[in-house]
Swiss-Prot record:
The gene is pqqB. Belongs to the PqqB family. InterPro entries: Metallo-B-lactamas, PQQ_synth_PqqB, RibonucZ/Hydroxyglut_hydro. Pfam families: Lactamase_B_2. Keywords: Plasmid, PQQ biosynthesis, Transport. Pathway: Cofactor biosynthesis; pyrroloquinoline quinone biosynthesis. This is Coenzyme PQQ synthesis protein B. The lineage of its organism: Bacteria, Pseudomonadati, Pseudomonadota, Alphaproteobacteria, Hyphomicrobiales. GO terms for biological process: pyrroloquinoline quinone biosynthetic process.
């Protein structure tokens, strides 16, 4: 491992599925994001990029917006006729906003795709993903808590977090909060630092809290501020927990749960278009007053 390297993390997309603004939504946040004078910038869908040397990168979740994300972030752009600094992609679940970008990466470019067996089967069972040339795209199945390296010198593990199967696999009422291969977090260790990426989490458990404690940085599920946010805004009928996402605020919320764990930097990502923390106001002030940061496209963290 190169001890002199920085662990460099770029938030490629800070929004949840649909982005901000969502194509068919006229909520307050989406209307503001369409107005250049509002100060609320549009945000793309959920993804991070990580590097140790600024040359080779791994991407966590392949957003439908990955072409735009590469365009917006110079370190990810090609440096010769046919080239990409993206050496690998790691999937944390099988949601559309984390898979669809794989189709954009189909243009005869080599990279390694890491996922659990359950998420890997979603990819292999869908013939549309055959556009990823198997001679160029190597698919690696990672067991829960198995050590692997998405980049040279970057130690990683996938670990189970409470969640559910993707929406398109639901058959009736899904089991909520189950821990298995369908929803995982990502643990990273390099340069003496320990970082976690958990874009989807249904609830905090004792084992998850113990894992996150004393981390240098945690990028965590910030989908909804309140559990009934989509119902109150008239944009949906489901609670956050029904969708597999613990709310930020309220009993059992992540604001209180993470605040107890002595985490150096706490950063919300995967933020829904309806979430009031996108704009100035009391909700954002409460989050920031507790020492949390609100992720945004292009945000860079160096450790």
């Amino acid at each position: 491992m190169n001890k002199t390297s920085d662990l460099r993390i770029i938030v490629l997309g800070a929004a949840a599925g649909g982005g901000l603004p969502q194509w068919n939504c006229g909520c307050r946040n989406c209307a503001m994001a369409r107005d250049p004078a509002s100060g609320l910038r549009p945000q793309t869908q959920s993804s991070l990029a990580v590097s140790l040397d600024g040359e080779s990168w791994t991407v966590f979740n392949a957003s439908p917006d990955i072409r735009q994300q590469v365009q917006d972030n110079c370190p990810l752009q090609p440096r010769r006729l046919r080239h990409s600094p993206i050496e690998s992609v790691v999937l944390t679940n099988g949601d559309i906003d984390h898979l669809a970008g794989l189709l954009v990466l189909r243009e005869k470019q080599a990279f390694t795709l890491f996922s659990t067996g359950a998420v890997g089967r979603i990819v292999s069972d869908n013939p549309v993903f055959q556009v990823l040339d198997p001679e160029l795209v190597s698919r690696k199945t990672i067991e829960i808590d198995e050590a692997f390296s998405p980049l040279s010198g970057l130690d990683a593990r996938l670990f189970a977090v409470p969640g559910k199967v993707p929406l398109f696999l639901e058959d009736g009422e899904p089991d909520l909060g189950i821990e298995g291969e369908h929803t995982v977090g990502l643990e990273l260790e390099a340069t003496g630092r320990r970082v976690y990426y958990v874009p989807g989490c249904a609830m905090m458990t004792d084992s998850l809290a113990a894992r996150l404690r004393d981390a240098d940085a945690v990028f965590f599920d910030g989908t909804l501020f309140s559990d009934d946010e989509m119902i109150l805004t008239g944009t949906g009928r489901k609670t956050g927990r029904r969708m597999g996402h613990m709310p930020i605020d309220g009993e059992g919320g992540s604001l209180d749960a993470l605040d107890l764990l002595n985490i150096r930097r706490k950063i919300y990502v995967h933020i829904n278009n309806t979430n009031p923390i996108w704009r100035a106001g009391s909700e954002r002030e409460r989050v920031e007053a507790r020492g949390f940061e609100i992720g945004y496209d292009g945000m860079e963290v160096r450790l």
